[in-house]
A protein has these predicted regions:
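Glycine-rich phosphate-binding loops that contact phosphosugars or nucleotide phosphates
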Residues: 1-115
Length: 115
């Protein structure tokens, strides 16, 4: 799908998630997705509730290594690993909430505003 001339994509296809997880392991599935789809001037949005997910940390490290633009949105603990490691993020937002309901709503509002 294109939006303002930019490709918009997210890894939500169960068959793609299964294939990437089986072939590369779940911790690297999303990182491999980036290998397939990221182009010049891509913006990767890294969202993690706990901020400790190895698969999201691998995506962040991939973005750092490839100098791909990325932003971070985490919740729960403010001193989470993703937030700490994200040195070159265009933004690094933390939502101070322990409620998954609030978190899901904020993620949805954020994505609606950005995408």
């Amino acid at each position: 799908m294109k939006f303002h001339g930019k490709k918009v994509s997210m890894l939500s296809d169960p068959s793609m998630i299964t294939m990437l997880s089986n072939d590369f392991g779940y911790d690297h599935a999303y990182e491999r997705f980036l290998d397939y789809y990221v182009e010049k001037d891509t913006l990767v949005i890294i969202m993690s509730s706990g901020g400790e997910s190895p698969n999201m940390l691998n995506c962040l490290n991939w973005c750092e290594e490839t100098k791909t633009n990325y932003g971070v949105l985490t919740v729960f603990k403010s001193d989470n690993k993703i937030r700490t490691v994200a040195k070159n993020a265009l933004w690094n937002y933390h939502i101070d909430s322990d409620s998954y309901g609030v978190v899901e709503c904020v993620h949805q509002i954020f994505l609606h505003g950005v995408v």
